[in-house]
Amino acid sequence: MSDPRYQIDVSVVTRYLKEQSDPENSRFAFAYTITVQNNGSLSAKLLSRHWLITNGDGEVEEVRGAGVVGQQPNIDPGQSHTYSSGAVISTRVGTMQGSYQMFAEDGKRFDAEIAPFRLAVPGALH
């Protein structure tokens, strides 16, 4: 969305969870920490999430749900909300992308896009 009142920026850091993975059974676990930064001029509440999780074979899992990790945080201008969660895929490499549905203090609903980010076992990519 180009309206500067509704500017939400999303940053992601991922980590492979070797101890929770089982490569022999095609189970690769990853943690991710996401920071949702409100760079707009209005407070906005994170209502829901929509994820597309794609494994290295191109198989896509779609996930929708209310809030993030049981919360629907209200994020004031200049403030951020950080949370951690995880995903399990069946290949050594995959991607996640999606959006958050936000509700601004002026009553407008808008989507905050989450750009694609990579899930990868260390050494899986050259």
UniProtKB/Swiss-Prot annotation:
It comes from the Bacteria. InterPro entries: ApaG_domain, ApaG_sf, Uncharacterised_ApaG. Residues 2-126 form the ApaG domain. Pfam families: DUF525 (PF04379). GO terms for biological process: error-free translesion synthesis. This is Protein ApaG. It comes from Pseudomonas putida (strain ATCC 47054 / DSM 6125 / CFBP 8728 / NCIMB 11950 / KT2440).
